């Protein structure tokens, strides 16, 4: 139990962060503000005067995980503030957990702080030097997510993000660059650019110029990527919608300004299914563009995600998807079974695919891609590549190459290599590979 003396000395907040990297950035902003106001951040329910839970509500499994996390926090602590995507469904949260102190939606910093102030009065004398230059981060010190916008203008039939996070709102480019500079100054070696639709950055403000370094810079993905690349850190683009404008960043990759890595969620390859999803459907043009990108940047890594078992997906259409994988030769791929999400338009589509068939298709999809990924990694044996050290374990050092985003891609194992600090960059020679990872030796 928290004593009055402890509360008077340093009010403490526990934090649970769930969901995607965009939610992680929201959590980091809340944590930074809490520290700026003098609150202590603790890692256990017992030590916390109040607990903030930043939720995810994108799919049913995420909703359930969030509700369970809220329930655990209530059981272990009792004073719980809920925010995040599931917070947009406040009635559901209060129905399941009526004891929560407050509920707010995503990117609701002011509302969260108001709720914290109501439950736990603001400390009298916070110190500015409690805040690291790059703010409070939930990631290791050597990499950080950089969120450049909120919301999305697309209305994909399987997605409810716009109803939770609203339409696209781009952050001012000067603000983004100042944050990036602070992160790099604090030791960050890799900036992972995230948003719901990175390639649409600036569309909402008609690409109007902002200011950074005393000069005007357009609020647009290409100009942002070029400016970020000038800071000296790795720059990795995530969640890039397959617009023609993607072609404009390929020269920056060829010139080494940003990493030769694109995370583009293609979702499917059947034109009919893509139309039902309300996604771009020119598959042949997509393959042509992939080949053109690789011709310009041979070391380009392509990551994508797909959905199998979408309502109405036939056997021939699933075979189209497998054929696309074989022609596209993507490096990293994630795949999900279609799951009905409350509020999604796709729920109303006819001919749902049976769960057993979804499972079978998912297995075949992953088997097909595993062979492709293994072959592409096997082709790297004997090459020298640059890696970034993440951590050390009892076997050696774990690092990542340009082709590996943290947590979702593979790693490069440096067995028997010790003493390298996280964030160190070095050149290694690839000795072995499997379908996911590489083994290498420092050069």
Curated annotation (Swiss-Prot):
Cofactor(s) listed in the protein's UniProt record: [4Fe-4S] cluster
Entry note: cofactor: Binds 2 [4Fe-4S] clusters. One cluster is coordinated with 3 cysteines and an exchangeable S-adenosyl-L-methionine.
Keyword Transport applies: no
Pfam family for this entry, one: Radical_SAM
Stretches assigned to the MTTase N-terminal domain: 11-121
GO molecular function annotation: 4 iron, 4 sulfur cluster binding; aspartic acid methylthiotransferase activity; metal ion binding; protein methylthiotransferase activity
Subcellular location(s) of the protein: Cytoplasm
Catalytic activities: L-aspartate(89)-[ribosomal protein uS12]-hydrogen + (sulfur carrier)-SH + AH2 + 2 S-adenosyl-L-methionine = 3-methylsulfanyl-L-aspartate(89)-[ribosomal protein uS12]-hydrogen + (sulfur carrier)-H + 5'-deoxyadenosine + L-methionine + A + S-adenosyl-L-homocysteine + 2 H(+)
Top-level taxon in the UniProt lineage: Bacteria
PROSITE patterns according to UniProt: MTTASE_N (PS51449), MTTASE_RADICAL (PS01278), RADICAL_SAM (PS51918), TRAM (PS50926)
Residue ranges annotated for the Radical SAM core domain, each copy included: 138-375
Domain TRAM: 378-443
Matches recorded under CDD domains: Radical_SAM
Record's protein name: Ribosomal protein uS12 methylthiotransferase RimO
GN (gene name): rimO
């Amino acid at each position: 139990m928290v004593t009055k003396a402890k509360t008077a000395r340093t009010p403490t907040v526990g934090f649970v962060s769930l969901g995607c990297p965009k939610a992680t950035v929201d959590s980091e902003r809340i944590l930074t503000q809490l520290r700026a106001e003098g609150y202590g951040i603790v890692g256990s329910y017992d030590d916390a005067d109040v607990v903030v839970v930043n939720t995810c509500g994108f799919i049913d499994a995420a909703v359930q995980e969030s509700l369970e996390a809220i329930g655990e926090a209530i059981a272990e602590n009792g004073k719980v503030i809920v925010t995040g995507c599931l917070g947009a469904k406040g009635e559901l949260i209060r129905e399941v957990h009526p004891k929560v102190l407050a509920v707010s939606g995503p990117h609701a910093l002011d509302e969260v702080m108001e709720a914290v102030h109501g439950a736990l009065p603001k400390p009298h004398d916070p110190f500015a030097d409690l805040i690291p230059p790059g703010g409070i981060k939930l990631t290791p010190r050597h990499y950080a997510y950089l969120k450049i916008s909120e919301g999305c203008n697309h209305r994909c039939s399987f997605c409810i993000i716009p109803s939770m996070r609203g339409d696209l709102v781009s952050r001012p480019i000067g603000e983004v660059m100042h944050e990036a500079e602070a992160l790099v100054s604090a030791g960050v070696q890799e900036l992972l650019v995230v948003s719901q639709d990175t390639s649409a950055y600036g569309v909402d403000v008609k690409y109007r110029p902002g200011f950074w370094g005393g000069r005007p810079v357009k609020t647009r993905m290409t100009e942002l990527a070029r400016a970020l690349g000038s800071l000296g850190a790795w720059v990795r683009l995530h969640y890039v919608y397959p617009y023609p404008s993607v072609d404009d960043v390929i020269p920056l990759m060829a010139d080494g300004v940003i990493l030769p890595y694109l995370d583009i969620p293609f979702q499917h390859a059947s034109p009919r299914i893509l139309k039902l999803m309300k996604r771009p459907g020119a598959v042949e043009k997509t393959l042509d563009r992939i080949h053109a990108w690789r011709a310009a940047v041979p070391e380009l890594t392509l990551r994508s995600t797909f959905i199998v078992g979408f309502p109405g997906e036939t056997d021939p259409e699933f075979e189209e998807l497998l054929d696309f994988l074989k022609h596209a030769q993507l490096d990293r791929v994630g795949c999900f079974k279609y799951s009905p999400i409350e509020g999604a338009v796709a729920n109303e589509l006819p001919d749902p695919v049976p769960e057993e068939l979804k499972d079978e298709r998912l297995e075949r999809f992953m088997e097909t891609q595993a062979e492709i990924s293994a072959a592409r990694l096997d082709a790297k044996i004997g090459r020298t590549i640059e890696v970034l050290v993440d951590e050390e374990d009892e076997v050696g050092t774990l690092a990542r190459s340009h082709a590996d985003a943290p947590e979702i891609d593979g790693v490069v194992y440096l067995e028997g290599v010790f003493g390298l600090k996280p964030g160190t960059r070095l050149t290694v020679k690839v000795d072995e590979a499997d379908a996911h990872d590489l083994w290498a030796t420092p050069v």
